Amino acid sequence: MEKMGLNEIRSKFLEFFESKGHYVANSYSLVPNNDKSLLLINSGMAPLKNYFSGVEVPPSVRMCTSQKCIRTGDIENVGITARHATFFEMMGNFSFGDYFKRESIKWGWEFVTEWLNIPEDKIWVTVYEEDDDSYDIWAKEMNFPEERMVRLGKDDNFWEIGTGPCGPCSEIYFDRGEEYGCDNPDCKPGCDCDRYLEFWNHVFTQFDRDEEGNYSLLENKNIDTGMGLERMGCIMQGVDTIFEVDTIKSILEAVEKLTGVKYGENPKNDISIRIITDHIRAVTFLVSDGVLPSNEGRGYVLRRLLRRAARHGKLLGVKELFLQKLIDEVIKVNDKAYPVLVEKESYIKKVVGIEEEKFNETIDQGTEILNSYIEVLKNEGKTVLSGQEAFKLYDTYGFPIDLTKEILEEEHLSVDEEAFNEEMEKQKERARNARGNMDGESWKEDPLSKLESTVDSTFNGYSEIYGEGTIEAIVKDDELVQSAEEGDKVSIVLDNTTFYPEGGGQVGDCGLITNENLVLEVLNTKKGANNSIKHIGIIKSGRISNGDKVKTLVDRETRMSAARNHSATHLLHKALREVLGEHVNQAGSLVTPERLRFDITHFEAISNEELKVIEEKVNNVILSSLDIKCDIMNIKEAKEKGATALFGEKYGDEVRVVSMGDYSTELCGGTHLTNTSQVGMFKILSEGGVAAGVRRIEAITGKAVYEYLKERDGIISEVCVNLKSKEDNLIQRISSLLEENKNLSKELHDMKAKMSLQSVDSIFDSKVEVNGVNLITNKFEGMDMDTLRETADNLRDKLGSGVVVLANVVDDKVNFVVTATKDVLDKGIHSGNIVREVAKIAGGKGGGRPNMAQAGASDVSKVDQALSYASEVIKTQVK
């Protein structure tokens, strides 16, 4: 058996199945396309789900891929063992109602024995215990020795996820030899030992499982196979773990070189090296597919991986930023299969560098805080960190909860995850609407997928808003029906339509569908299963039936307004790249008739001056009256023309290219104007951050700009009246009022400072001594926080040595401030711990540094009791 590298194995696999009539698809993005049910692509078939369910028509009934995948379900084991990984590639061949078991098994055997040259006597196979067809194909048609065939039960050899498509599977194993086995003389696949390594699963999707657990035969049977590239690399290179496989080993060696730590000499260091090696692969591919670090969703997965790798670099003694440097090696070993990595190299490095730098700024302080929590837990004989403290580490210092758990586990401690999650939910409630469920895969079918034949709705609306068509399908109450009547809410499918379906960030068209017996108000238009276009609306009068001839009329005003905003997004995109840099990519958009929203990848706020330049550029192009042209061409020609593609989007062989003179060229399927002058005018309304590394611009065009300027003019007139100023003198009048306010504020601050010093003199004599430490406590009412902190500082300075604990009651709330001199810190005093315990008495919480801390509470009746408790806390700290 000849050794093969990962890149060669991948190439051979795709070449083999191409020779068998398969369409070779490039790996899909790790970000699912139009699938909110899945966070990240985690299997070879995941991006093909709509082909299996019939929602979309595949480019061929035979396909093969080598698909990038991410799984983080067992991330805590990555690095701890040499088997687990978060990033991997899954090679697979697929049939959508074409070939079935015979061809799948036959070609699998041919590839393994003739293309990979794996010795036949090293191969074992398993089949589902009730699948006689597969068994006979292996035994009788392939002449495979029955002594190396094993029948296994449902848990091992039957694939299903709840209800829906499912079926038996046949797995191919490699016999690694007796030295990997157990003492069982009957050892074979199905045993838990390491001898038999499963490397290729062939799933025969032939059944449909209902909610009662009954199985019925599918009309169109499918094939879904999966072969882990890295696992096959272990077999072909004769190594035990993926970290010894050529391309991954190369990255591991780069980690060794950067850290100066040798792999294989220290088990603890080996864990860190494996974690960094695995995670930098995942991070590189995630960023290349447009994922950015954030605190939720797939962005959180990226942040978690990146920060975990960064921490383990520190454990290996790395002090500077280093993850960026490892990206070079990841790209080097993957550049042939994934040229996009080369194209996005500088962008990937920038994203990773910024995130690592952010984490470096807080990790030392966060680690110090966590270590102090750990010390308190051990001193008090406790083993569980509170959820509130874990959340503070997450919210203030950027510690993902998983990282906190990992550090605690190293000390044989744990965290109250339930309480942490409660704190997280509170924050989400405060900061944003709860986001939808993104866990797991949904197999809910579009009713249109039940149609016996494909409905190819043809869109004729790029240049026309009027048209004619025939009703091909009617959906009412999520069921296909033959007819519908006045008042019914329906979705109808036409063979031809001028209604644009929602897509590319642009909302769907609205309007009317009519004939002599019908008026249907279309409220929205969307893409449906089987290449259909769904017209969603209400029957205002009459009735409809399948086969009826109808006329389509798109609302001209809303179509034109949406086209203005869509064309403007192209001009905006180009202007943003000119002003901010080529790293800018579209990260999302929303085009409605009322306004446009455009998200971009950029790593800092866009200044007002930059926004002015961007806005001016767009308006200059509008005034230049450039022709807008839309052409269909192959993807290669489009790229040669310099067309900008949507980051991470999957395109077919033919694409639609929208050109605006020589200024902007983009791939786009939306509706557009014919000349830039039709935009009228462009105005940016706002700019802000929506996630780490993502900025959002909202803007308006055309008549909306006129209405906006008219409203602003009215506001300015009203301000002039209220300030008794003329418009040309308004700025000067406002500046004068601000200066007056500034002087009054300074007078107020000086007065409060004077009162604070007077308070110090009257309070100082109340000091007491606790275990050799001077302590001053006092309660104020109606004082602002700045003055309270200033008073505490003045008391501490006058005290010279000791602790100051102050409380301030405002309305029904109380604030605590604790400060301590440097010398008492050496005696064990910790202001953060004091304020936390004191605040608890009054129903509050807080914390901070050893020398300074503050807290808030709600029970004002317990303030005196809380202040008195400060002396008890000090007694426990000073031994």
Curated annotation (Swiss-Prot):
Primary localization class, coarse: cytoplasm
Reactions this protein catalyses: tRNA(Ala) + L-alanine + ATP = L-alanyl-tRNA(Ala) + AMP + diphosphate
SMART domains: tRNA_SAD
Gene3D superfamilies cross-referenced by the UniProt entry: 2.40.30.130, 3.10.310.40, 3.30.54.20, 6.10.250.550, Bira Bifunctional Protein, Domain 2, Threonyl-trna Synthetase, Chain A, domain 2
Subcellular location per the Swiss-Prot or TrEMBL entry: Cytoplasm
Organism listed in the record: Clostridioides difficile (strain 630) (Peptoclostridium difficile)
Cofactor note: Binds 1 zinc ion per subunit.
Chain residues that bind Zn(2+): 566, 570, 668, 672
Biological process annotations from GO: alanyl-tRNA aminoacylation
One Gene Ontology cellular component: cytosol
Cofactor: Zn(2+)
Main enzyme class: ligase
InterPro entries attached to this UniProt entry: aa-tRNA-synth_II/BPL/LPL, Ala-tRNA-lgiase_IIc, Ala-tRNA-ligase_IIc_anticod-bd, Ala-tRNA-synth_IIc_core, Ala-tRNA-synth_IIc_N, Ala-tRNA_ligase, Ala_tRNA_ligase_euk/bac, DHHA1_dom
Function: Catalyzes the attachment of alanine to tRNA(Ala) in a two-step reaction: alanine is first activated by ATP to form Ala-AMP and then transferred to the acceptor end of tRNA(Ala). Also edits incorrectly charged Ser-tRNA(Ala) and Gly-tRNA(Ala) via its editing domain.
Family: Belongs to the class-II aminoacyl-tRNA synthetase family.
UniProt-listed Enzyme Commission number(s): 6.1.1.7
Stretches for region Disordered: 426-449
SUPFAM superfamilies: Class II aaRS and biotin synthetases, Putative anticodon-binding domain of alanyl-tRNA synthetase (AlaRS), ThrRS/AlaRS common domain, Translation proteins
Description of its domains: Consists of three domains; the N-terminal catalytic domain, the editing domain and the C-terminal C-Ala domain. The editing domain removes incorrectly charged amino acids, while the C-Ala domain, along with tRNA(Ala), serves as a bridge to cooperatively bring together the editing and aminoacylation centers thus stimulating deacylation of misacylated tRNAs.
Record keywords, A-Z: Aminoacyl-tRNA synthetase, ATP-binding, Cytoplasm, Ligase, Metal-binding, Nucleotide-binding, Protein biosynthesis, RNA-binding, tRNA-binding, Zinc
HAMAP family: Ala_tRNA_synth_B
GO molecular function list: alanine-tRNA ligase activity; aminoacyl-tRNA deacylase activity; ATP binding; catalytic activity, acting on a protein; transferase activity; tRNA binding; zinc ion binding
Protein name: Alanine--tRNA ligase
